[in-house]
Design a protein with these regions (language model features):
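Short, low-complexity, charged/polar segments at coil/turn and helix-coil boundaries
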Residues: 14-100, 123, 131, 136
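Disorder-to-helix initiation segments
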Residues: 1-21, 106
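Short helix/strand-capping connector loops at secondary-structure junctions
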Residues: 94-113
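Protruding loop/beta-arch "assembly-hinge" segments enriched in small, turn-prone residues
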Residues: 110-136
Length: 136
């Protein structure tokens, strides 16, 4: 046994369609804010181990980049990624499932950064939407 309730969302759909420019601007701003933050976090190296003579090259840092926002409206998305052509070892350092034991607990993974920043990223989008629709 079940109850089905249907509602007419045409007014909401019309409102969203009439506000597509504002939605696009807010989404683009939120994506730019979020990808800049995540890129910075993924490029951040932990402190070097005391007594280590290894000279860091910055190659892993330089392998990380972000692409401009893709898509349209509420389907817009951003991408932050590490290029394995630049740093072939990137997964052994920052991939949550492939990280080498020597790096566990020292280097942030994509998963730890995602979990750490989820709330702040949501706040960035909320702020951009509020800003886009202020006064309407």
């Amino acid at each position: 046994m079940e109850i089905t309730v249907s509602v007419d969302v045409s007014a909401v759909r019309a409102l969203l369609n009439s506000q597509s420019r504002r939605i696009n601007l807010a989404m683009r701003g939120g994506i730019n804010d979020a990808t800049a933050l995540l890129l910075r976090d993924m490029r951040t190296y932990p402190a070097q181990r005391p007594g280590s003579s290894y000279q860091r090259t910055g190659t892993l840092r330089n392998s990380w980049s972000r692409r401009p926002p893709q898509g349209h409206g509420l389907d817009m998305y951003g991408v932050v990624g590490s290029d394995p052509q630049i740093a072939p070892y990137n997964a052994q350092v920052q991939h949550p499932e492939l990280q080498a034991a020597v790096h566990v607990g020292r280097w942030q993974t994509t998963e730890t950064v995602t979990n750490l920043r989820r709330g702040l990223v949501q706040q960035m989008f909320d702020d951009r939407m509020r800003e886009a629709f202020a006064g309407t």
